[in-house]
Amino acid sequence: YFFEKDMADHAIKWMRTQQAAAPDKPFFMYYAPGIAHTPHHAPKDWLDKFKGKFDQGWDKLREETFVRQKRMGIIPANSQLSPRPAALPAWDSLSADQKKLYARLMEAYAASVSYSDFQTGRLIDAIRETGELDNTLIVYIQGDNGSSAEGGPEGLLYEQSTITGRKETMAEKMAHIDDIGGPKLYNHFPAAWAWAMNSPFPWWKQVASQAGGVRNGMVVSWPKRITDKGAFRSQYAHVSDIAPTVLEAVGIKSPEVVKGVPQKPVDGISLGYTFQQGAAPSARRMQIYEMMENFGIYKDGWMAGTLPKRAAWEAGAAGDRKLTVGPDQREWSLFNLDTDFTTAKDLAKKDPAKLKEMQDLFWAEAAKNNILPIHDYSQGTQGRPSLGAYRTSFTYRPGAATIAEDAAPHTIGKSFRIDADVTAGSSTKGVMIAQGGRFGGYSFYLKDGKPVFHYNAVGADNFTVAADSALADGKHTLSAEFAADKAAPGTPGTLTLYVDGKAVGSGRLGRTVAGWLSHTEGLDIGLDRISAVSPDYSVQDSAFTGQISEVRVSIK
């Protein structure tokens, strides 16, 4: 199963159904694929298409892209290419195994993106079949930020390794090289590929203060209205400009009141003026950016922004993430985009007066646009609303499904106990409670009538504790109690199983998750949805075959 294909199938079906019901009525579709977010998955035949395509490495690929962009007229002929950041290794410095592994991770990325683009092409072909393609406005945005460097210098078999505090070894990665791009892994390429993908700009996703974190290509097609086909436009634009562009094209205004509620004014500026006026000055003169304490401001051709305070792969990492540099102590850069499209020449030291002007503008606009106060999540969560962080007791009954991690018991770095009141026997199987999935989590279930607790700390770090004997038929309270060795994220500890208060099994959990259990799956009662925490069962056969009265979780 691939989501991108399924989404395209549904989009095409919806469009055809709508046209069958009302062929003269226009339609609006917002189509947002999950790619190129991790995991980078694709069918095997698509993975095979890209074997050997990136053996030249990231330095050469970035240069090749830069030369091609110049030749095509996408960037100015006098553009300069910024150097590789010191935190990233040169391709030529890598070992043979590193090159083989890293190239394969990039092949999986390319295959996943190409497969997703193919599905978008199917959707456009379906519009063409209706005869309305020339009269259809299509806005194709390349991405929502810069390419992701969150795979770190060495890439990842599991993106969760970073957020759970797990270190992947080179030997482990090489042992799984043939699984890259498939369902067993949650793979992400090394950060240097992200740097190459962001050519000609420096930096990457998260760094909203720099061009590599915010600039993306965009294609607008509307053959009936746009006569300058294949031409480039360089006016400064922001994603908030898309909605006003669509509204102007349709000929309607954004409502000022919806169901009696006054609406905030639309920030965007229609890009319709660029359709026929290639040389028109940019209607958007100013834009503010902020993400994870990366501050940026654009004004009339000038771009000022902070330099990253930490690497992208450190931002979501488990462990101590306290900042040592405050918002007022950040180092800033300054670029004149009119003469330096690729932001290769930092003018911050040469023009401190202009930099100060831009910094003052940032703080003024931040106050106007509800960006203040700026509080990085690494500075702590005290005072933030949470449905689960401040609770120590949780009670669930059958039917509770996919409860978000923040609302579920916060077990990271803590001792905890699970008690399940059930009616079961020697033939009962299935999940009583599960949180997370294949790439991190825990599950308490019955297998052949025996209580089992499985803790999935990602990859090879899986731990199972099982009772020796099956249950007698009847009502029971089944318990799993984890005694942490210490109150710290990632702590090992001892897991003990109980049946009606009597210990029936015990074992060590060599490590626990240090960050999030799962950033994609929640807590389930009575079955395990989306993906299975334990290899002992599948999602399809995870349903509890006995009866559950309630499940209680207590945090100690």
What residue spans do the PLM features occupy?
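Extracellular glycan-associated modules
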Residues: 373-556
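Active-site regions of oxyanion-processing enzymes, predominantly non-cytosolic
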Residues: 4-83, 112, 116, 121, ...
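Substrate-binding rim/cap in mid-to-C-terminal beta-strand-loop elements of soluble/periplasmic
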Residues: 52, 124-125, 160-281, 451, ...
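C-terminal, low-complexity/hydrophilic appendages and adjacent surface loops
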Residues: 196-216, 289-350, 354
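Core domains of carbohydrate- and sulfate-ester-processing enzymes
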Residues: 40-42, 47-94, 148-216, 304-321, ...
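Structural recognition of the beta-strand scaffold that forms the well-ordered cores
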Residues: 27-32, 137-141, 200-202, 218-221, ...
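Short, solvent-exposed loop/turn and secondary-structure capping segments
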Residues: 25, 30, 38-47, 80-81, ...
